[in-house]
């Protein structure tokens, strides 16, 4: 059990009741039961002061029980105990104290029996004195006679034992004895006693004096009790360092001494205790005491002083000089431990002083920075520039500077001016003196004949001497010259002037001889030209004034920072001045300055715990500031200083940072060394080598964390830019070799897992230095607690050299730290040119320092971050060099073993920071971001040109090739074009963080959209194959799939990641870490799989019987079909496509889409995969070349498949060129006229289909669909399959709902005059150019009521041409017959001509010809068509125009296209919208029956065996219904009129009824082998109409 308390709160366990306690004690004593240690022992820690009784200390009050008190730090604290004598406790339990170095849980305190004592005495014969002393370490508390016994310990643990025999203990103690507080404990700081501890000691001394009759003294430093000035008082002095290395454990007062002599002495005033002490014996008067002194926190091998400010710890000894030669620095620190009863600490916690070593360091010669380029040597024409640098001379045998001192280069200025001519000299001026000799001057002017800026060669003025009268003698003299004035010009030869005064005045003339003024030229350098001056500029809220090239201008920092910014005016190679980048190395943001002030406030706190918690808050705030990524280069240097103070404070306060604090600390370092800060670090290097200081801070913090670890414990910290491994191993038993990094650890970053960097540290390297040999590194000494006998305290002459122990203690540990930096090589000071850091940087640090092996054993493998380098060298960082800013890489410590394409292996001798130095390629810069590479530009440009060509062709012929497939293709091309443009934009190095993030997000969107549009094309082909009509809703779904699905994926990814991972410092694409890349790879893979599935389904559909137009393939496939399915109805010109069968155009388009997906989709996947690799790894030329090849091939393939190989585009181009097919009629939807492609719109196709469709209806067969069902499928559900053709039970026919390839097997008809069976007589609707007509067979059978599905929806005004003869409309026309009313068997002419809107039968011709099949009459009867009459074509109805244009009519109207003529033909059609209600269907059905025209008059032919072409045509379709046989000229009109009134039975007898029921004599209609119907119209017919 462990108990912690404050101010007396120790472990306390009160028994439930005295009766229960007595029962337990009696049982244990009766059976001689030894109590279990877990139930009889207690451990207390953290007790500063307390007074305890038996029931407070022991869980179970019994003999053998123990109570152990822990000293938190024996080097700094001491335990003071006062034992208050109580007779019952002493008599029954004989308490004694045992000072222990280690706590033993199962240790028993029972006194050994006499037999065991004898055996123990025999075993102790021959034991050394140390073991005897340890055996006699127990102190009997009741051996003295006084009321108090004082004890002083500096051990780790003090154990209080009840050591009496069980038989001697009573069954029950008195309650007063149980509650008597017989032990008082006080924990005192040896060097900083608080007021409370001194007050307790003073009270003890006062009580001791009252009991003894005289004063008692305590030799405790820093404590003084009031009233101690008497003679008997003990003065308090500070003890010096111990004179001996090993002292005894404790001091107790002598047994026989009187109570008045019970004084407590400190460890420094006692002699060695060498006599043996056994149980029951009195201790000697001079017992021995073992004292341990506190050590320095920074230097564990040195002892700390014990004098100084009582409110703070003493200063530690000065550390070893930081340099082995020359002038270095020494540091000493102190920490403050304050209790609530003490005062706060004041003053600094760290001091630094310079130190000079006797050894002189060799100083190599160092070049200073190059000076600025001089102005051109000539003001015009071609000259030269030069610049110089100065070499700091070497000292003490250092190397001289290498390299040139002067550099020159050519310069070209403006053309030199034309030399002018001097004019005549002017007159001489006056003499300069009035007496004696003087000078005269004259001048001349330059005549400029050329440009205004031409000059003349020669002097402008001329001077000569002049003689005057002698000056009179005077006694005056000149005074001293004053200082020269400022130059009148800063350049281009100005002048300076100085004066002197005449000190005396003569009687006549000028008082002094000579002149009192002197003038001399100055600033002879040429003034910079206009192009050599930097203009005024306003950048970042700062105004930079104009300056000449080479000058540095200083300015205030931006408003959000304090300090000064600088900027240099530079000169380009062409001689033009320009401003360099501003330097903000001396600018510090307000937030960072406030954070530093809060750091100072935490440092001012005296208590360690508060200071440690304050540092945790500082690290948390610093992480939040750096995460914003808005800071200056000066903020980075300031952050390094903050981290150094945090590390020192953690170390001084002995505060163990938590795991979160450690993670935040290294996360801050990761933010600072990020590659985005390379330019900031380059700027900061001009002021201070902050990256080198950061490297040292990281190493110190690693060892701070490692000291808090347990033995064999390790810690791994992983961030975006560095990986840290920390482990603690005992010095005497290092477990195994060290390998770093462990790539298989959980949480490891991808850049570490895939890297080839490796460290191998054999355990032979981990050995301490030999005795007396100085340490070889600046690491701290061994963290052992005690000083071994082989160590010697530092003397005055060896204060800066630390000696390691010869035999390390078992408690000494190695702290091994390894760090792999991802980007540190970019920010460390670079080596001398032409070398550069071409690998990652790895740091290895071990403390205490190890002995360097005789040969290199440390193996390091470092992978390259720059490809194409040459001459690699392994190097280590050398801290001993004086100037760290010039580059401290040392290549002599490591050997380069092996160089491969991906990494280099090194072997080094010393532990340090390692890297590979090599010469980078000449055409490679170390910039992580730059302009796009040439392969990327070529690939994107070729692909964009191909796609733009495709878009231009489609835009030119859009009205001819507009379709769903074309729209999908255009969206697909736009997504690829946008992707190529964004790839090029993302490679630019001028993008900001926000623009790069947006570029990555849009790239993600367009990459996914390109895949989705390929999937949309597959979906469209699938819908075309299954024959489902695409409504506008389906088209909107196309857009949702193509653009909506990628937008949803990108929105979800951005929302979850908060744009983290969209764009990195190296590229503008999805980050390869964190799993964000799966947001693109996952959907793309799913789309590819779904596309493959749809492709397989479409292919199976096309290979089925309805999807193959080739008859041979169908026969091989063994599919059965209706025998009449290969025939075509006479209305093939309508362009209708049968709904249950797939048209050849749809099959062709579906096959083209399938083939396009199979070719484009794999190429698209390869292109974007290579694009991702090329963007993420710019150094790889292979990936960029692959992307260029795949991207170019993708553009060409898309253009070829969808443009050059597409049939629609080919037809458009042919028709534009005038190459048209001659076998197509004028009215064909795909025919060409006058070089133009005549393509019907969806509306005109619907009208053409409605007017030229033939519908066969039968009672007991399939339910035929309406035109509404044919066009828009409104009457059928979308998922309902169309009905197939069937054969009736008696051989009757059943057809598909709409026109198709139908073969009509004609059954045998009854004889003439016999009525046919009603079930075999079906109403026949024939179509012409003007509309539909019904061959009325109602006189053979009554018409049955038709269902709502047995009708066709036709326009209200189907025909507007009226017959030329009588029988017009008007009131005499019969009304429409109600549905279901039977008609009479015969009809008169009046009945036939009673419909005003239809043509009578005399305007139609019925013929049999080769076009629609042949018919042989076995009875020798012929059928003569009626002669043409000028009824419909020549006599139009008043107010209505003709529907057709004869081909023989000349004029400009013939030049109209077929499209215009069809629009004219259907211009006055008024279609009603189809409704989904039964009422509207019924009305349309009745209207349809009213407008059908009935055929009742036909003429007979006299010729028996003549082949006839028969057709039913309206007057408006004469060009396609011309009979092959013309009537004889002599035929009488009466005969024609008679034949016109012939009944239908006669016609049936001569034609259909006369054929025998043999297959070879069946009526054969025109086959569809040469007919290719157009595609079914897309869209909703009801909505479009």
UniProtKB/Swiss-Prot annotation:
Residues 33-936, 987-994, 1058-1078, 1143-1153 are extracellular. It comes from the Eukaryota. It is found in: Cell membrane; Secreted. Keywords: Cell membrane, Disulfide bond, G-protein coupled receptor, Glycoprotein, Membrane, Phosphoprotein, Proteoglycan, Receptor, Repeat, Secreted, Signal, Transducer, Transmembrane, Transmembrane helix. Its main location: membrane. Gene3D superfamilies: 1.25.40.610, 2.60.220.50, GPCR, family 2, extracellular hormone receptor domain, Rhodopsin 7-helix transmembrane proteins, Thrombospondin type-1 (TSP1) repeat. One of its GO terms (cellular component) is plasma membrane. It is a multi-pass membrane protein. The chain crosses the membrane at residues 937-957, 966-986, 995-1015, 1037-1057, 1079-1099, 1122-1142, 1154-1174. One of its GO terms (molecular function) is G protein-coupled receptor activity. Glycans are attached at residues 106, 191-192, 266, 356, 437, 560, 645, 867. Residues 229-271, 767-806, 1359-1385, 1423-1454, 1498-1585 are annotated as: Disordered. InterPro entries: AGRB_N, Angio_Inhib/Adhesion_GPCR, GAIN_B, GAIN_dom_N, GAIN_dom_sf, GPCR_2-like_7TM, GPCR_2_brain_angio_inhib, GPCR_2_extracell_dom_sf. One of its GO terms (biological process) is G protein-coupled receptor signaling pathway. Detected in cerebrospinal fluid (at protein level). Strongly expressed in brain. Also detected in heart, thymus, skeletal muscle, and different cell lines. Residues 229-238, 769-780 have a biased composition (Low complexity). Changing residue 908 to W: Inhibits autoproteolytic cleavage. Residues 958-965, 1016-1036, 1100-1121, 1175-1585 are cytoplasmic. SMART domains: GPS, HormR, TSP1. Residues 1543-1552 have a biased composition (Polar residues). Residues 1372-1382 have a biased composition (Basic and acidic residues). Glycosylated. Autoproteolytically processed at the GPS region of the GAIN-B domain; this cleavage modulates receptor activity. Additionally, furin is involved in the cleavage at another site, in the middle of the extracellular domain, generating a soluble fragment. Heterodimer of 2 chains generated by proteolytic processing; the large extracellular N-terminal fragment and the membrane-bound C-terminal fragment predominantly remain associated and non-covalently linked. Interacts with GABPB2. Interacts (via carboxy-terminus) with TAX1BP3. Interacts with GNAZ. Interacts with SH3GL2. Belongs to the G-protein coupled receptor 2 family. Adhesion G-protein coupled receptor (ADGR) subfamily. This is Adhesion G protein-coupled receptor B2.
């Amino acid at each position: 059990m462990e108990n912690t308390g404050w101010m007396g709160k120790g472990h306390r366990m009160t028994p439930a009741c005295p009766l229960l306690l007595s029962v337990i004690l009696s049982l244990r004593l009766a059976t001689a039961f030894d109590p279990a240690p877990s139930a009889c022992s207690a451990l207390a820690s953290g007790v500063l002061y307390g007074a305890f009784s038996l029931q407070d200390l022991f869980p179970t009050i019994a003999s053998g029980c123990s109570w152990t008190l822990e000293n938190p730090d024996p080097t700094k604290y001491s335990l003071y105990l006062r034992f208050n004598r109580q007779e019952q406790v002493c008599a029954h339990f004989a308490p004694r104290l045992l000072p222990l170095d280690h706590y033993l849980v199962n240790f028993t305190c029972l006194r050994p029996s006499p037999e065991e004592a004898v055996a123990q005495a025999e075993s102790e014969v021959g034991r050394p004195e140390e073991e005897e002393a340890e055996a006699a370490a127990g102190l009997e508390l009741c051996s003295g006679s006084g009321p108090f016994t004082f004890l002083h310990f500096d051990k780790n643990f003090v154990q209080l034992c009840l050591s009496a025999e069980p038989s001697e203990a009573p069954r029950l103690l008195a309650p007063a004895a149980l509650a008597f507080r017989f032990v008082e404990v006080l924990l005192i700081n040896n060097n900083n006693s608080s007021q409370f501890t001194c007050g307790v000691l003073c009270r003890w001394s006062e009580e001791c004096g009252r009991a003894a009759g005289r004063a008692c003294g305590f030799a405790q430093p820093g404590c003084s009790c009031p009233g101690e000035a008497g003679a008997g008082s003990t003065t308090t002095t500070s003890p010096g360092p111990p004179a001996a290395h090993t002292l005894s454990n404790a001091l107790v007062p002598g047994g026989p001494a009187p109570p008045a002599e019970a004084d407590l002495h400190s460890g420094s005033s006692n002699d060695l205790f060498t006599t043996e002490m056994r149980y029951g014996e009195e201790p000697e008067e001079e017992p021995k005491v073992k004292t341990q002194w506190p050590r320095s926190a920074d230097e564990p091998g040195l002892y700390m002083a014990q004098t100084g400010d009582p409110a703070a710890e003493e200063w530690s000894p000065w550390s070893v000089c930081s340099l082995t030669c020359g002038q270095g620095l020494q540091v000493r620190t102190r920490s403050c431990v304050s209790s609530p009863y003490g005062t706060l600490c004041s003053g600094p916690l760290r001091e630094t002083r310079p130190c000079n070593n006797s050894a002189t360091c060799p100083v190599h010669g160092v070049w200073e920075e190059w000076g600025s380029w001089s102005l051109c040597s000539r003001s015009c024409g071609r000259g030269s520039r030069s610049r110089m640098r100065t070499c700091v001379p070497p000292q003490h045998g250092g190397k001289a500077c290498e390299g040139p001192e002067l550099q020159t280069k050519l310069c070209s200025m403006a053309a030199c001016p034309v030399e002018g001519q001097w004019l005549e000299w002017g007159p001489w001026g006056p003499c300069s003196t009035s007496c004696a000799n003087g000078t005269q001057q004259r001048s001349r002017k330059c005549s400029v004949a050329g440009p205004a800026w031409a000059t003349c060669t020669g002097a402008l003025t001329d001077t000569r001497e002049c003689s005057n009268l002698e000056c009179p003698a005077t006694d005056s003299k000149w005074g001293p010259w004053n200082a020269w004035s400022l130059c009148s010009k800063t350049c281009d030869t100005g002048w300076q002037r100085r004066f002197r005064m005449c000190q005396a005045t003569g009687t006549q003339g000028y008082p002094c001889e000579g002149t009192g003024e002197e003038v001399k030229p100055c600033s002879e350098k040429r003034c910079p030209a206009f192009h050599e001056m930097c203009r005024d500029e306003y950048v970042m809220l700062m105004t930079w004034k104009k300056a000449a090239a080479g000058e540095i201008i200083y300015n205030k920092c931006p408003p959000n920072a304090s300090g000064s910014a600088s900027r240099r005016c530079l000169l380009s190679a062409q001689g033009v001045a320009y401003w360099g980048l501003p330097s903000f190395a001396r600018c510090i943001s307000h937030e960072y300055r406030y954070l530093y002030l809060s750091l100072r406030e935490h440092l001012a706190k005296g208590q360690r715990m508060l200071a440690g918690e304050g540092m945790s808050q500082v690290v948390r705030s610093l992480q939040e500031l750096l995460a914003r990524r808005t800071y200056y280069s000066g903020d980075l240097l300031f952050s390094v200083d903050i981290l150094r103070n945090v590390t020192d404070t953690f170390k001084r306060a002995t505060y163990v940072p938590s795991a979160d604090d450690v993670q935040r600390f290294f996360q801050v370092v990761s933010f600072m060394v990020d590659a985005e800060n390379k330019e900031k670090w380059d700027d900061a290097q001009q002021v201070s080598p902050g990256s080198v200081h950061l490297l040292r801070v990281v190493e110190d913090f690693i060892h701070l964390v490692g000291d808090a670890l347990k033995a064999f414990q390790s810690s791994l910290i992983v961030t975006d830019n560095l990986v840290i491994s920390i482990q603690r191993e005992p010095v005497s038993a290092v477990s195994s070799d060290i390998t770093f990094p462990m790539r298989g650890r959980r949480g490891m970053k991808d850049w570490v897992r895939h890297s080839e960097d490796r460290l191998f540290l054999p355990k032979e390297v981990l050995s301490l230095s030999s005795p007396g040999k100085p340490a070889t590194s600046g690491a701290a000494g061994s963290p052992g607690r005690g000083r071994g006998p082989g160590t010697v305290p530092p003397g005055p002459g060896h204060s800066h050299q630390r000696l390691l122990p010869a035999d390390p203690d078992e408690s000494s540990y190695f702290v091994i730290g390894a760090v792999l930096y991802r980007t540190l090589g970019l920010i460390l000071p670079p080596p001398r040119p032409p070398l550069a850091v071409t690998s990652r940087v790895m740091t290895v640090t071990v403390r205490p320092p190890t002995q360097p092996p005789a040969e290199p054993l440390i193996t390091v493998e470092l992978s390259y971050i720059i490809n194409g380098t040459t001459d690699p060298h392994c190097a280590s960082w050398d801290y001993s060099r004086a100037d760290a800013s010039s580059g401290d890489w040392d290549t002599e410590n490591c050997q380069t073993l092996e160089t491969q394409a991906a990494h280099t292996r090194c072997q080094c001798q010393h532990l340090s920071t390692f890297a590979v130095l090599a010469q980078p390629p000449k055409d490679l810069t170390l910039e992580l971001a730059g302009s796009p590479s040439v392969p990327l530009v070529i690939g994107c440009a070729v692909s964009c040109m191909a796609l733009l060509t495709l878009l231009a062709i489609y835009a030119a012929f859009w009205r001819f090739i507009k379709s769903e497939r074309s729209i999908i293709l255009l969206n697909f091309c736009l997504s690829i074009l946008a992707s190529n443009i964004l790839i090029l934009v993302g490679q630019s190095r001028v993008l900001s963080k926000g623009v790069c993030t947006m570029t990555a997000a849009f790239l993600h969107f367009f990459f996914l959209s390109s895949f989705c549009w390929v999937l949309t094309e597959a979906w469209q082909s699938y819908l075309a194959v299954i024959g489902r009509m695409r409504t506008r809703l389906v088209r909107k779904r196309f857009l949702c799939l193509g653009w909506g699905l990628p937008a949803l994926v990108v929105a979800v990814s951005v929302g979850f990641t908060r744009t983290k991972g969209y764009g990195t410092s190296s590229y503008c694409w999805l980050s390869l870490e964190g799993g964000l890349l799966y947001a693109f790879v996952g959907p793309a893979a799913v789309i590819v799989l779904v596309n493959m599935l749809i492709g397989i389904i479409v292919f199976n559909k096309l290979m089925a019987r309805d999807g193959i137009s080739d008859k041979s393939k169908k026969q091989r496939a063994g599919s059965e079909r209706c025998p009449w399915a290969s025939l075509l109805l006479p209305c093939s010109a309508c362009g209708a496509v049968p709904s249950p069968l797939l048209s050849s155009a749809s099959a062709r388009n579906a096959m083209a889409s399938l083939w396009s997906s199979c070719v484009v989709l794999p190429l698209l996947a390869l292109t974007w995969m290579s694009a991702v690799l090329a963007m993420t790894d710019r150094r790889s030329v292979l990936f960029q070349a692959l992307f260029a090849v795949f991207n170019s091939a993708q553009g060409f393939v898309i253009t070829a498949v969808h443009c050059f190989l597409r049939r629609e585009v080919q037809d458009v181009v042919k028709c534009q060129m005038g190459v048209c097919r001659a076998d197509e009629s004028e009215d064909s939807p795909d025919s060409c006229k006058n070089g133009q492609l005549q393509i019907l719109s969806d509306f005109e196709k619907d009208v053409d289909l409605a007017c030229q469709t033939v519908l066969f209806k039968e009672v007991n067969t399939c339910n035929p669909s309406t035109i509404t069902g044919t066009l828009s499928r409104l009457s059928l559900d979308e998922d309902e399959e169309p009905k197939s053709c069937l054969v009736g039970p008696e051989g009757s026919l059943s057809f598909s709902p709409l026109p198709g390839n139908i073969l009509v097997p004609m059954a045998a008809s009854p004889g003439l005059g016999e009525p046919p069976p009603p079930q075999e007589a079906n109403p026949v609707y024939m179509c012409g150019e003007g509309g539909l007509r019904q061959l009325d067979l109602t006189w053979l059978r009554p018409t049955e009521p038709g269902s709502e599905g047995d009708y066709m929806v036709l326009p209200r005004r189907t025909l507007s041409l009226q017959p030329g003869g009588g029988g017009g409309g008007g009131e005499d026309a019969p009304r429409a017959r109600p549905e279901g009313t039977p008609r009479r068997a015969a009809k008169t002419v009046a009945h036939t001509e009673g419909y005003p809107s239809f043509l009578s039968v005399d305007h139609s011709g019925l013929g049999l010809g080769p076009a629609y099949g042949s018919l042989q009459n076995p009875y020798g009867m012929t059928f003569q068509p009626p002669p043409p009459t000028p009824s419909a074509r020549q006599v139009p109805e008043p107010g209505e125009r003709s529907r057709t244009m004869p081909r023989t009519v000349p004029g400009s109207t013939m030049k109209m296209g077929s499209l215009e003529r069809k629009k004219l033909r259907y211009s006055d059609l008024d279609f009603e919208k189809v409704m989904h209600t039964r009422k509207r269907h019924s009305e349309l059905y009745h209207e349809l029956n009213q407008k059908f025209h009935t055929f009742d008059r036909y003429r007979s032919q006299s010729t028996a065996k003549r082949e006839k072409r028969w057709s039913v045509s309206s007057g408006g379709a004469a060009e396609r219904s011309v009979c092959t046989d013309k009537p004889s000229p002599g035929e009488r009109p009466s005969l024609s009129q008679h034949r016109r009134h012939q009944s239908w039975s006669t016609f049936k007898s001569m034609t259909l009824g006369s054929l025998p029921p043999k297959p070879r004599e069946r009526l054969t209609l025109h086959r569809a082998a040469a007919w290719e119907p157009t595609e079914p119209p897309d869209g909703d017919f009801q909505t479009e109409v």
